[in-house]
């Protein structure tokens, strides 16, 4: 199972604001782009992939929207608008939820009022954790561990205090090259590299 976490620190948990910020300063379109590149291939979808989108611009609690490739159906298309519509559906379903609650929106689509740190703590129990960092070891020079989970951010960098907690959880820093890339581009390159490793190329 491959997992991805996108920590979207500027992404609003209000569905209308999410829509308003497509192409705006919060760049909420990145959420759809990461979903598209993590879950789908040409004319198909990947198996055994999960993406967690953590939206943190909120008046109450962060929202973690989880999409499971093996379970999701009725997506409505592979385009940005269809994927944004799924996020809107999840956010609308989360209205009124208390802290650390879970709501199944539809098969393969879940929303939780859980923080990035709490989510990471859960995943650390059964996943090999990797954080994208330009100064990390090249992904081509390491052996990817079982059940890898790759941690990405939007245009707002990861805060230093999170770096300390990730270090305690054993998160490894890895690099995809010398250039800073969009999170969605990182997802594609990660998939490609693991595809090569698994195929023995």
UniProtKB/Swiss-Prot annotation:
GO cellular component terms, alphabetically, are: cytoplasm
Q: Where in the cell is it found?
A: Cytoplasm
Q: What class of enzyme is it?
A: transferase
Checking SUPFAM superfamilies in the record gives:
alpha/beta knot
- Tell me which InterPro entries the record gives: Alpha/beta_knot_MTases, TrmY, tRNA_m1G_MTases_N
Q: Which GO terms describe its molecular function?
A: S-adenosylmethionine-dependent methyltransferase activity; tRNA methyltransferase activity
**The enzyme's E.C. designation:** 2.1.1.-
Whether Lipid metabolism counts among this entry's keywords is no
What protein family does this chain belong to?
Answer: Belongs to the methyltransferase superfamily. TrmY family.
The name this protein carries in UniProt is Putative pseudouridine methyltransferase
Lineage, top ranks: Bacteria, Pseudomonadati, Pseudomonadota, Gammaproteobacteria, Vibrionales
């Amino acid at each position: 199972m491959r997992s991805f976490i996108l920590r979207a620190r500027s992404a609003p948990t209000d569905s209308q604001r999410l829509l308003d910020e497509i192409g705006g300063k919060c760049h909420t379109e990145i959420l759809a782009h990461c979903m598209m590149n993590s879950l789908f291939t040409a004319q198909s979808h990947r198996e055994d992939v999960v993406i967690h989108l953590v939206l943190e611009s909120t008046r109450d609690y962060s929202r973690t929207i989880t999409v499971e490739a093996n379970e999701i159906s009725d997506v409505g298309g592979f385009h940005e608008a269809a994927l944004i519509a799924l996020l809107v559906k999840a956010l609308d379903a989360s209205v009124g939820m208390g802290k650390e609650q879970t709501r199944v929106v539809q098969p393969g689509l879940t929303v939780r009022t859980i923080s990035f740190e709490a989510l990471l703590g859960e995943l650390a129990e059964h996943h090999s954790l990797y954080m994208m960092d330009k100064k990390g070891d090249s992904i081509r020079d390491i052996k990817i561990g079982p059940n890898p989970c790759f941690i990405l951010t939007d245009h707002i960098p990861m805060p230093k205090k999170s770096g300390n907690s990730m270090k305690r959880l054993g998160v490894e820093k890895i690099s995809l090259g010398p250039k800073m890339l969009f999170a969605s581009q990182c997802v594609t390159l990660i998939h490609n590299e693991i595809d090569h490793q698994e195929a023995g190329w």
